[in-house]
């Protein structure tokens, strides 16, 4: 696996080019501002009615429609929600691309699952910071950066990889390390991680633990602290030094209990289900299901959102978080 740093990337591959960042959400604002402050010529492409137009202009960025920004640009970074990209690409991006342009993405979903199929005369690259946008922005302003993944899907000009590395450098990523991968590997591992561990697995584990304690007669407040609130303390230890750092930092009681009881929860049957989830990502079944869900008006997703928001852990959690003066209230 190739890892690149400051000396491996040259901003010259982006200097003098017009760069459009489509979208101004979590990642979009970080990409646009970091590239602008790296001395590059950037504009933001948004719907005219978007509330983000005013925010981008207030930050000193030029704002145009998606079509206008694409037509003006040599390099176009698509940072719109996955489910919106195909329609916007077909209507406003593709008609305004010309041979030799570069089309960039922050995630490979639409390229990998062939929702978007660019012309062969276009460079297609991916630059994916492995952090939320606010952290991409904050570390840049502090003179640092976050690790990034890059991939080249199509190299029409012979400069696609150099452009991807230069973009990662302009984000600050080469100060932390830039890993070269493929669209396929980024997409499939990202989706699996979200579903089986980060967003799906962890949420269900938290709820099951909370419910087990409450059903046994313990106060909801204690159940919340033990199964939700304190999870951050453990994850921070993982983040800083891996599993060993966590085991070293907790009590012997916690370490022994975790090592002997944890495998009783995450059994071979659970791992077998993980493999099924991965297969659904790999063969496109999840992508088709998600696209159909979006096209159908999010009926199942909205139902699931309502069920989750009504869970007891959400209600007691909101009450307890109001008592935590150190939390930034939003």
UniProtKB/Swiss-Prot annotation:
Family from the record: Belongs to the ketol-acid reductoisomerase family.
Cofactor: Mg(2+)
Catalytic site: 107
GO MF, any single term: NADP binding
Cellular-component GO terms for this entry: cytosol
Function per UniProt: Involved in the biosynthesis of branched-chain amino acids (BCAA). Catalyzes an alkyl-migration followed by a ketol-acid reduction of (S)-2-acetolactate (S2AL) to yield (R)-2,3-dihydroxy-isovalerate. In the isomerase reaction, S2AL is rearranged via a Mg-dependent methyl migration to produce 3-hydroxy-3-methyl-2-ketobutyrate (HMKB). In the reductase reaction, this 2-ketoacid undergoes a metal-dependent reduction by NADPH to yield (R)-2,3-dihydroxy-isovalerate.
Protein name: Ketol-acid reductoisomerase (NADP(+))
Origin species: Pelodictyon phaeoclathratiforme (strain DSM 5477 / BU-1)
InterPro entries for this protein: 6-PGluconate_DH-like_C_sf, KARI, KARI_C, KARI_N, KARI_prok, NAD(P)-bd_dom_sf
GO BP, one annotated term: L-valine biosynthetic process
